[in-house]
UniProtKB/Swiss-Prot annotation:
HAMAP family: His_tRNA_synth. GO terms for biological process: histidyl-tRNA aminoacylation. One of its GO terms (cellular component) is cytoplasm. Its main location: cytoplasm. It catalyses: tRNA(His) + L-histidine + ATP = L-histidyl-tRNA(His) + AMP + diphosphate + H(+). This is Histidine--tRNA ligase. It is an enzyme of class 6 (ligase). Its EC number is 6.1.1.21. Belongs to the class-II aminoacyl-tRNA synthetase family. It holds the Pfam family HGTP_anticodon. InterPro entries: aa-tRNA-synth_II (IPR006195), aa-tRNA-synth_II/BPL/LPL (IPR045864), Anticodon-bd (IPR004154), Anticodon-bd_dom_sf (IPR036621), His-tRNA-ligase (IPR015807), HisRS-like_core (IPR041715), HisRS/HisZ (IPR004516), HisRS_anticodon (IPR033656). The gene is hisS. It is found in: Cytoplasm. It comes from Yersinia pseudotuberculosis serotype O:1b (strain IP 31758). One of its GO terms (molecular function) is histidine-tRNA ligase activity.
């Protein structure tokens, strides 16, 4: 017998029981985005490889070790997108959306990184990202954070996430700090693990977010990035903190927060949780004022964030037992006897016409009435609509409330109004 073909490791199927909660969460996220005036943009899953090398940085872990890259039949190097910002910027430049314009954009979809699969971290994962172009001030940074805070409240998880902030300054300020940090690390190389030694010269700021406790203790005595910030970056960060204080958004300044992608400058932030174990970051982002020009456009201030949906779903399930997922089916049509099957089909169609938001399922494939009621219960229906030979002949329907067992017989013409009342 042929061996079953299974999903690729780290790339998961999401079954109907899973997608119901995903859809509910996504609808809340999209509603909030709409309320802030953001518009959806959809980009390809596959991009030219140089896009990510130029945007993310050739010596980052993402580019060096995690990208799914291949040559097409024309010999062109292509990559499954590992993140969404680079593609969004590319699309904005290509279609003339960015120059001398303000844009508030969002996107949602699968991303791909070759990582070791674990809870909340997969090789195919889903992100929702938001990007703002054309606004240089700290006020838009604050609005993005307020937007995310509104999400957490709507999802019932605000008390389980904490905001961490930092400013990594300008490119010139980071260059000066990088030199001082490398000099410090060279004096303590015996404390560094192999990963930190590898990063020490290629991407030394990433040593700051090492999970090694010995390295973290060493960094207590390292030069502080805040001491190297340019004056404009200091003022920008102070302005952001002031706005968050006025909006009563609690936060912690984490001077070791640097983010793993090279395009960031000034503001960086993360929403973290301790409710999911080691995988603590739920949402992260920051400012990337140089990226548009770096990818061939005109200099354009920009800021944004991305959120892993797998991790968000896990968090909602872990901490909000009251989170409600709408039933898949409101009403289930049960039929028995000659002529009842076609009558059931037509009844369901007429109810869909009368109540466009009604979720109604018709029993097909036969089965006695008891089995049909079992199917109605299994799909979570609130109401059963029963048609037998006598009901078909009399143009009537038996309407049964599956929660309390009460039932009544109505004329078919009255069923829509009764359902609207029962289902609210």
């Amino acid at each position: 017998m042929a061996k079953n073909i299974q999903a690729i490791r780290g790339m998961n199927d999401y079954l109907p029981a899973d997608t119901a909660i995903w859809q509910r969460i996504e609808s809340i996220l999209k509603q909030v985005l709409s309320g802030y005036g953001y518009s959806e943009i959809r980009m390809p899953i596959v991009e030219q490889t140089p896009l990510f090398k130029r945007a993310i940085g050739e010596v980052t872990d993402v580019v060096e070790k995690e990208m799914y890259t291949f040559d097409d039949r024309n010999g062109e190097s292509l990559t499954l997108r590992p993140e969404g910002t680079a593609g969004c910027v590319r699309a904005g430049i290509e279609h003339g959306l960015l120059y001398n314009q303000e844009q508030r954009l969002w996107y949602i979809g699968p991303m791909f990184r070759y990582e070791r699969p674990q809870k909340g971290r997969y090789r195919q994962f889903h992100q929702l990202g938001a990007e703002v172009f054309g606004l240089p001030g700290p006020d838009i940074d604050a609005e993005l954070i307020l937007l995310t805070a509104r999400w957490w409240r709507a999802l019932g998880i605000f008390e389980h996430v904490k905001l961490e902030l930092n400013s990594i300054g300008s490119l010139a300020a980071r260059a000066d700090y990088r030199e001082a940090l490398v000099a410090f690390l060279e004096q303590h190389v015996e404390v560094l693990d192999e990963d930190c030694k590898r990063r020490m010269y290629s991407n030394p700021l990433r040593v700051l977010d090492s999970k090694n406790p010995d390295v973290q203790q060493l960094l207590d005595d390292a030069p502080k990035l805040s001491d190297y910030l340019d004056e404009e970056s200091k003022q920008h960060f102070a302005g952001l903190c002031e706005l968050l204080d006025k909006a009563s958004i609690p936060y912690t300044v984490n001077e070791r927060l640097v983010r793993g992608l090279d395009y960031y400058n000034r503001t960086v932030f993360e929403w973290v949780t301790h409710s999911l174990g080691a995988q603590g970051t739920v949402c992260a982002g920051g400012r990337y004022d140089g990226l548009v020009e770096q990818l061939g456009g005109r200099a354009t201030p920009a800021v944004g964030f991305a959120m892993g949906l797998e991790r968000l779903v896990l968090l909602v399930q872990a901490v909000n037992a009251d989170f409600q997922v709408p039933a898949t089916v409101d009403a289930y049509v049960i039929s028995s006897g000659e002529g009842s099957q076609s009558a059931a089909m037509l009844l369901a169609e007429s109810l869909r016409d009368a109540l466009p938001t009604l979720k109604i399922m018709t029993n097909y494939g036969g089965g006695n009435v008891k089995k049909q009621f079992t199917r109605a219960d299994k799909c979570g229906a609130r109401v059963a609509l029963m048609l037998g030979e006598s009901e078909v002949a009399a143009q009537q329907v038996v309407v049964k409330d599956l929660r309390n067992g009460e039932q009544e017989t109505l004329a078919q013409a009255d069923v829509a109004a009764r359902l609207a009342l029962m289902l609210g």
